Each structure stands twice: as structure tokens, then as C-alpha cells.
Amino acid sequence: ERLGLADAPVQLASETSVEDIVSTLSEGAVPRLIVIDSIQTMWTDTVESAPGTVTQVRASAQALIRFAKKTGATIILVGHVTKDGQIAGPRVVEHMVDAVLSFEGEGSQQFRILRSAKNRFGATDEIGVFEMTGLGLREVTNPSELFLSERELGSPGTAVFAGIEGTRPVL
């Protein structure tokens, strides 16, 4: 309700079995966007090892990727990160997917940066800046304006400089 999505065509489910997920998604119209959170907890009964192992993560991701290619659905595989920002658990999925994106920012800050580490279809040196509002995440179309608005005018020892993040100039 807070995000204004009460009537949106969104369905939620809680499941970690890839076979059950694919079976459910195959019933009726296939969703255009599927979010799996998190790939490290998925498991498939085609592999005899514990969830989270390299074998399970790879097999689960492969099954979901096959489903996406067969149906044309877009699947976002969420992977959690460690405290130092590395993808938690096995890193095999990075080599299987079309893009690896990270959402960076401190929990106490209202701004987040979306950064691309891999992108088969475009540049990896681009960023997106977003602001967490009461209505959810909103794109910051002019990050320079945002950064300059927080600047104290007349502060000794400060300067504005033009930098480049990807192809985007940032002040």
C-alpha cells in the first residue's frame, strides 16, 4: 500500500525448490519479470548436495535460465554479498548470467548507486543513482545537482571538481 501497488499485477511466493518454482510459473500466463531472492538458497532435486553448494547453485541457476530462454521471461537472480562487498557463496552464477549488477549504499543513507560489473548487452562503466523515499526507490536524474545541494558554501578548503563516472560527468 505504501508504494501504491495494492492493485498492481504482482504475485509473491515463498519457495526454494527450483522444480516447484518452474512448475508454478508454467501454470497459466508466464510472468514478464521474475525475481528470485536469493539464488544461494535455491535447490534442485536433480543434484544430491546441500543448498548453497557450488553444484546446487549452478544447477538451480541453469534450470532457471533454461526456463527464461524457453519462455522469454526476464529473471533477476538476487545474490547476497559479504560485509566486504563480495558475492556470498559460490561465484559460478556470475559466468552464467547476462549482467551482474550491484546496489551500493549504506543502510543509514537515502541514496544508492547501481553499478554494473558485467553486461553482455552494454557498457559496464555506467552508474545509476537512486534515492530511497517514502514511496520507494526513485531515480536521481541529475546526481551533480544532488551532490552540490549538500555542499556548504564558503567552507574553507573545499572545491568542486568535474569527474567522470562511466560516460556521466559528475560534479
Put a short name on every predicted segment.
Residues 1-66:
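Conserved inter-motif catalytic segment of the P-loop NTP-binding fold
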Residues 2-6, 16-20, 39-42, 54, ...:
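Conserved nucleotide-binding/hydrolysis micro-motifs of P-loop NTPases
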Residues 26-34, 40, 105-171:
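Conserved P-loop NTPase
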Residues 36, 75-77, 91:
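Long C-terminal interaction/binding lobes of large macromolecular proteins
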Residues 44-51, 82-83, 156-160, 171:
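Short hinge/gating elements
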Residues 45-46, 86-88, 112-113, 126:
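Short glycine-/acidic-enriched loop or helix-start segments at secondary-structure transitions
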Residues 55-76, 80, 96-107:
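Substrate-engagement module of ASCE P-loop NTPases
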Residues 86-96:
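Short regulatory helix/loop adjacent to the ATP-binding pocket of P-loop NTPases
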